[in-house]
Amino acid sequence: MSFKMTQSQYTSLYGPTVGDSVRLGDTNLFAQVEKDYANYGDEATFGGGKSIRDGMAQNPNVTRDDKNVADLVLTNALIIDYDKIVKADIGIKNGYIFKIGKAGNPDIMDNVDIIIGATTDIIAAEGKIVTAGGIDTHVHFINPEQAEVALESGITTHIGGGTGASEGAKATTVTPGPWHIHRMLEAAEEMPINVGFTGKGQAVNHTALIEQIHAGAIGLKVHEDWGATPSALSHALDVADEFDVQVALHADTLNEAGFMEDTMAAVKDRVLHMYHTEGAGGGHAPDLIKSAAYSNILPSSTNPTLPYTHNTVDEHLDMVMITHHLNASIPEDIAFADSRIRKETIAAEDVLQDMGVFSMVSSDSQAMGRVGEVVTRTWQVAHRMKEQRGPLDGDFEYHDNNRIKRYIAKYTINPAITHGISDYVGSVEAGKLADLVMWEPEFFGAKPDLVVKGGMINSAVNGDANGSIPTSEPLKYRKMYGQFGGNITHTAMTFVSNTAYENGIYRQLNLKRMVRPVRNIRNLTKADMKNNNATPKIDVDPQTYEVFVDGNKITSEAATELPLTQRYFLF
């Protein structure tokens, strides 16, 4: 016996299905469902009178020993990922995603590959969007509270360096030396997110670099405040090649030790993560942006220049002065700061992100960037570029899937690949840690509904604890049980170099968290960047700072109004 319902009735019960489009927040972007794993009429839903009950969509006979029985299922989720926009159930077991498919009871339902049993909990994701937890690869570990702010924006992994509020940490993403690295690895035991630390990359003595990799650093940071010379960079890359770790570069703004071409000559054909490749965050003035054309450079933006607005240039001078410990009474310090800020290259940056020339977005937390705005600013750029440049190839009305996949890759899978952690995190795929962010569509990109970290709810919008229902005002983000007791040790990862892992750094420091090695880094090229691997010819006019791609000038207009702003953040 069949039952017919209208499309609007179906959507209100089970969320969108194939061909339906969902608007992302108050942006102009629409995600269209490409595939639905559901069998119409066999949808698994929880609640009074719903299907997930004993003997119905919940199997009464299975136990947790069955490998297909889930610990947790997110039902009828709209998954937005770098390679798919699909409607599916998400099965989680032992803290990992084990299946994207159809949940229910295979005894009475067809095509079930995620079994719901007595040991299964449910998160109702009907009508909601689920994305992979975001990855911020430019974090100054200045303040432990950054982790909570990031979680509440949809970020579940931090990579960078620092030791707290030292001048070194405030200016450079560096955790210098074995002693500091060990202390930060121990501090990470209580952080509710995944973390990895980068060591200081300035030393001609390889032993001084190698001891940091042995101590657990997942890479080296070369920063101009410590001296970003071609020599220092080359030595850091030598060690990185030996130990399969990444090098992140904040290049030489003043061109003291050479120009952009000299830096690239020192790099040779070795892979490198180029921080804030536009240059306002630091790097060869005025043409660092040209490095994004190289096939061995993995370029990222930091979020204060994204998107380009009428306020962007004005706010940057003070940020540079404070972050880099400059003195406003010294003319040379003012000149240094001023040389980094060029509206022409900033205006071009949004376009390069939209073309897939820039591959990643990060924060530069509390050091010329905002740790809670990586996700928001990424989608603001996507909105602005659709406004100014129209749909990408293959997109059309109510279908921005190609642009959406390009932009979500910038803070999920591509940072994971760049730093050797894509086997563990970065996408909604079977086998990966269940770091998932759930959004009401109208709040997408601004405020998540809840964050699942390693299979446990870690942070969620919830009401007054004395309320009679969970939605009693005030509704606000609250820590969930995933952050209490020993749960962090079972749901969050600490990333270390492979050599530190093999030498038992977790035993040496008595680390309780899941410790995992980074890997497969030194063989990367830009071709490995998902949906963001373009390598056109880039030129910068040395007088006007105008940017040209394959001979064509690129620029964007300064925004005076943006989505995902005051409408969402009045309270």
Curated annotation (Swiss-Prot):
Active site per the UniProt annotation: H324 (proton donor)
PTM description: Carboxylation allows a single lysine to coordinate two nickel ions.
Enzyme Commission code: 3.5.1.5
A Pfam family recorded for this sequence: Urease_alpha
Cofactor note: Binds 2 nickel ions per subunit.
Primary enzyme class: hydrolase
Binding site for Ni(2+) 2: K221, H250, H276
Keyword Transmembrane helix: no
Domain Urease, residue spans: 133-571
Cofactor: Ni cation
Gene Ontology CC: cytoplasm
Gene Ontology terms, MF aspect: nickel cation binding; urease activity
HAMAP family: Urease_alpha
Family: Belongs to the metallo-dependent hydrolases superfamily. Urease alpha subunit family.
Subunit architecture: Heterotrimer of UreA (gamma), UreB (beta) and UreC (alpha) subunits. Three heterotrimers associate to form the active enzyme.
This protein's name: Urease subunit alpha
Species whose genome carries this gene: Staphylococcus epidermidis (strain ATCC 35984 / DSM 28319 / BCRC 17069 / CCUG 31568 / BM 3577 / RP62A)
Gene name of the encoded protein: ureC
